[in-house]
């Protein structure tokens, strides 16, 4: 699963997830892409589950790029532990996503296969997404 190899600090503040995606909004590598329409937090497990769904559908053809990386640690205190005594341990890693952010890209397959693969991937994600193609200028 995706997570940083090392970080400067073990735990982070929760923070806010506001605004629109300024970077990562263009189709850079592939021909087709899956773009976020909502804001939310994608866990490393959700990113991996969507990737597996896509790769199973396209089989051996095509290439997939994952354009998001879970770099925010989420902490949780153990069950039945009273409040206080410091912050809990890191439970999992998330990626904060704003509307307009490209999540996955794909090339080397037909548009119908790409649409179906992204539809399967979108079912694994907790946010609304949209299928986009690269625009040639």
Curated annotation (Swiss-Prot):
Gene3D superfamilies: Ribosomal protein L10e/L16. GO terms for molecular function: rRNA binding; structural constituent of ribosome; tRNA binding. Keywords: Ribonucleoprotein, Ribosomal protein, RNA-binding, rRNA-binding, tRNA-binding. GO terms for cellular component: cytosolic large ribosomal subunit. GO terms for biological process: translation. PROSITE patterns: RIBOSOMAL_L16_1 (PS00586), RIBOSOMAL_L16_2 (PS00701). NCBIfam families: rplP_bact (TIGR01164). Binds 23S rRNA and is also seen to make contacts with the A and possibly P site tRNAs. HAMAP family: Ribosomal_uL16. Belongs to the universal ribosomal protein uL16 family. Part of the 50S ribosomal subunit. This is Large ribosomal subunit protein uL16. It comes from Thioalkalivibrio sulfidiphilus (strain HL-EbGR7).
């Amino acid at each position: 699963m995706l997570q940083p190899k090392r970080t400067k600090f073990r735990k982070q503040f929760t923070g806010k997830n506001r605004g629109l995606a300024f970077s990562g909004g263009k189709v850079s590598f592939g021909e087709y892409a899956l773009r976020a329409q909502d804001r939310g937090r994608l866990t490393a497990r959700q990113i991996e589950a969507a990737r597996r769904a896509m790769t199973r559908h396209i089989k051996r053809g095509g290439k997939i790029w994952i354009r998001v990386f879970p770099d925010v640690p989420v902490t949780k205190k153990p069950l039945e532990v009273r409040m206080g005594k410091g912050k809990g341990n890191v439970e999992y890693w998330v990626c904060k996503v704003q509307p307009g952010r490209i999540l996955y890209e794909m090339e080397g397959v037909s548009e119908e296969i790409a649409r179906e693969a992204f539809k399967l991937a979108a079912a694994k994600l907790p946010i609304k997404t949209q299928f986009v193609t690269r625009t040639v200028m």
